[in-house]
Amino acid sequence: MGVSNMKEMDCVEVIVEDDSYAKEGVHQGMQGWICDSRCINGRWLVIIPQYGEKENIATLPIKEEDLVLLPGGMDARINERIRGMIFISDCIYSVH
């Protein structure tokens, strides 16, 4: 891997749906911020927040290639919308 263009405090978006992330409640399209200055084994430690004062969805290491920078900042409301869509989808499929 070459020199990274990401750094601590950068806002990022998860661009893949990955089972290991999904187990932690993190899905493609969710946004967060890098909370550690170190990229360890090609992974950044990312906080995926909810909107307002709610508890974070997750803090987990995410592969750099699974992230894209959000230079304009992030919007935690998107994370809640995605969580809601996943919940509804899970409910629909569990009925059948």
What are these regions (language model features)?
Residues 2, 7-75, 89, 93-96:
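Basic/aromatic-rich interaction segments and small domains that mediate binding to polyanionic partners
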Residues 78-81:
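Intrinsically disordered, low-complexity linker and terminal regions at domain boundaries
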